[in-house]
Amino acid sequence: ERGWFDILDDWLKRDRFVFVGWSGILLFPCAYLALGGWLTGTTFVTSWYTHGLASSYLEGCNFLTVAVSTPANSMGHSLLLLWGPEAQGDFTRWCQLGGLWTFIALHGAFGLIGFMLRQFEIARLVGVRPYNAIAFSAPIAVFVSVFLIYPLGQSSWFFAPSFGVAAIFRFLLFFQGFHNWTLNPFHMMGVAGVLGGALLCAIHGATVENTLFQDGEGASTFRAFNPTQAEETYSMVTANRFWSQIFGIAFSNKRWLHFFMLFVPVTGLWMSAIGVVGLALNLRSYDFISQEIRAAEDPEFETFYTKNLLLNEGIRAWMAPQDQPHENFVFPEEVLPRGNAL
């Protein structure tokens, strides 16, 4: 006798245009609510009460300048539930306090996890290995570290990125000014992973296109391919000879080549996520104190490192009063950074 679980299992895994599955119970509601919350916030909701900013289409922003802003610093790490003590069930007040940000961040995180579980589930049903899901763990790690773990290490959700294009750019400048993020080795590994992955992708695609078998008469080489054909569609031997002539070494194993293409960007993103967890704890890296001391003592000595530190000071001094108006920062002229050349 089949129970309700088996009946539900059959329905969830039924062959349909968009597969649902058990993962869909988490994925579809969370993705719908996160995207819907973002579209609602960017269309109607102001950031006047949290950041002193206009951030919606209703206020005159465009696609690049709208955002769903983080809650005010005074909210701390409250989940800002609609029925919580801050909003007390008042939807308008909840939006004004920044409740949409926590709503989107949490539903977005669970939506991404649901998408990874979807890849696990379908891989199991189709009978393939789960490397797609493993690879997707990298962007999830970056999202969770940047949007959740970093602000949890700071004083409030206020210091997380707001959900918007220009808002993310502001956050990048904040990370540079307050953490010297570009000199952090974990960021360097992240850049190497992303750019290295792009390079590998371009090289691989070009090499395959270069070595396609001439097995059709059409103007387009794409027409000669059949997804059910048994034979190879390009010559690995020719590709190997081509790169052997250029570099002296080349991949001779397709499985190792494709694992390497998986490994480079995924490892880079994971390293970057680990670095952001370090920033959540205000860890520092690569402070070249000897250069700083010499630059302070010798007016003629300056390096790109010491110049960048001055730029960071400038970001902090000019950004903090704008970015954190609730602190009422006032920096007198004499504390603003001056380079040795000045």
UniProtKB/Swiss-Prot annotation:
Membrane topology: Multi-pass membrane protein
Domain of life: Bacteria
Pfam families recorded: Photo_RC
BP GO annotations: photosynthetic electron transport in photosystem II
Protein residues bound to pheophytin a: Q119, N132
Lumenal domain ranges by topology: 51-113, 156-196, 285-342
Top EC group: oxidoreductase
This enzyme's EC code(s): 1.10.3.9
Catalytic activity: 2 a plastoquinone + 4 hnu + 2 H2O = 2 a plastoquinol + O2
Positions contributing to Fe cation binding: H204, H258
UniProt-listed PANTHER family: PHOTOSYSTEM II D2 PROTEIN, PHOTOSYSTEM II PROTEIN D1
Record's miscellaneous remark: 2 of the reaction center chlorophylls (ChlD1 and ChlD2) are entirely coordinated by water.
Protein family (similarity comment): Belongs to the reaction center PufL/M/PsbA/D family.
Protein name (database record): Photosystem II D2 protein
Organism in which the protein naturally occurs: Thermostichus vulcanus
Gene behind the chain: psbD
